[in-house]
């Protein structure tokens, strides 16, 4: 094969006349360029480390401070209050240094120390300022004078042109709430869900815990919070994600869909070429830390950026007791799956990223390849879809050496995984409901063997060139993947574009190395494990009842006329829909973020409250007047927003109780209260997909360029998982999941109730979809 010869830098043969040495200049050139690329990345990391290390100051400010100190010395002004003189005396006891040299060195040393002190003062001041969260609880649209002054001070101490990780050391630590406060909020959250006798029993357990065991566990948790960067995140990652022994497909991984109504080209290889290039451009901005940190409140309050570190070059590695996350600093290839074969594709040539047309060329070569899968190769990824222990044992037994290890390393150390899917998915006008549902299900689990579920992201390109992502959950949360996905869709359509015939712009390049097949030697025993895993995963996938639908009757624009939070509006609609569907209330999970704190991830908002229940019951009671319903709606919305703010500012319920439970396990003490709290099922699990880069899309000019967002599998066997994205002013997309095996749930039925609930609530305000009010 030609590519095999290109990979050899030199060859030699022994002849009677001596050694005949033949050099491959092209191979040597690529080796040289690869080395230069590696050193360039190291230099960029070193430079960024310095810039981030001195933030909120800048490296150039060191020169300003030092020059200022030395200049003041020449004017006989001592800014050091005698410290420079002390440094001067201790510099040279031998008398070999001239007086002028000692003065300059002393000035530089003092100036450097002063510069470091200024940096630390600014950083600490910024951390103190960012610890204030009173602005979040202010009335919407109103800002007090003190808050304006506080914002101005934050901007002063925030420096200029921050890089992706510039604010990390200035972010406050997640505070540990008081045990009594958490217990009190917990009891308030379950009050509407329990009968009187059950609530009294739980109250007794909670009060006993708050007085006796709770303070002891809290002491250890406080101790951890003093030395750990975040007292929750490492345990959350380990015990909620990595120690789970069940399948991560459906149960943990989630998916993202692309634009609903627009497909910019129908050439599969071309769409893959453009979007892979866009992903690589995004990866480059992350590697160079050029991505702007996300900031709230008019680009003032920074959020933690730590989760971007493992977006690429990352894979979850199975273990018998616990999994681990493997992240490599750099990866120069991707692995592509097509028709049962695995291909390794290099991403660089001549020291640069492959261009979109070159990537299209690579993808087309894979699509045109007629070779057959090796024994056991086609369904190999089913191991990543089923239980973790069989996969861990199989990996250790059959993939720890030889060609299997080399090929598995190529997959696990790839920048990301790509599937060129053989099916066609996406919105079809003749059958909109079934087509969108099929699209979502394909991204969630595919055929159970054509996604590498352990990779941080699996990028899927369907035969008709629709695209999507399946993401592993342990390394980061959905907003990180969402941010990438917004960039990819906008760059693909508005920046890169396509030629008139649907191909990527640019020319082919005959000199780039062709994709290479990964080689496997999978014995019969391993193939049996693969088939068993596939059977288990298929059973799980076939049980998923997934309904994804657009709601375009009204959107955020009309909801804002109600003077309420769009998220609170939708959450109350979900409560009303659930009651219509089930005839009862249930413990409800809404994901909130805690990225106002360093290494923060998520917190739970318990959306089913006494106030929301009162509103729902009023809506179901035909004797209740519209005025009464309206009043109860407002009260319920205010309560929900208050709970959301508490969760964002570190005063949530569930992460604190989870960590107390972990401490109790380490101490080998039993807590009936914690055990019961953590065993309560979330029969309605919800999450909003935030739109973070609104400047990338002009929905007034391009109304059809709306994203569908993404979704996840049901959390409880007899419950619903609901995800939604609010796009522009007039569009909301919902994803509802449940299990066919549950006689109580039906995702399509819940969807109908949700549509009706949205209409019922908007009617309270006398508004319709076409209202000019």
UniProtKB/Swiss-Prot annotation:
Reactions that this protein is recorded to catalyse: (R)-carnitine + hexadecanoyl-CoA = O-hexadecanoyl-(R)-carnitine + CoA; succinyl-CoA + L-lysyl-[protein] = N(6)-succinyl-L-lysyl-[protein] + CoA + H(+)
E.C. number(s) listed in UniProt: 2.3.1.21, 2.3.1.-
Transmembrane segments: 48-73, 103-122
Residues on Cytoplasmic side: 2-47, 123-773
Segments on the Mitochondrial intermembrane face: 74-102
Residues bearing PTM 3'-nitrotyrosine: 282, 589
The keyword Repressor is assigned to this record: no
The keyword Nuclease is assigned to this record: no
Keywords: Acetylation, Acyltransferase, Fatty acid metabolism, Lipid metabolism, Membrane, Mitochondrion, Mitochondrion outer membrane, Nitration, Phosphoprotein, Transferase, Transmembrane, Transmembrane helix, Transport
Gene3D superfamilies with a match to the protein in the record: 6.10.250.1760, Chloramphenicol acetyltransferase-like domain, Choline/Carnitine o-acyltransferase, domain 2
Highest taxon in the source lineage: Eukaryota
Active-site residue list: 473
GO MF terms, alphabetically ordered: carnitine O-palmitoyltransferase activity; identical protein binding; protein-macromolecule adaptor activity
Homology family: Belongs to the carnitine/choline acetyltransferase family.
Subunit note: Homohexamer and homotrimer. Identified in a complex that contains at least CPT1A, ACSL1 and VDAC1. Also identified in complexes with ACSL1 and VDAC2 and VDAC3. Interacts with ZDHHC4.
Name under which the protein is recorded: Carnitine O-palmitoyltransferase 1, liver isoform
Taxonomic source organism: Mus musculus (Mouse)
Protein encoded by which gene: Cpt1a
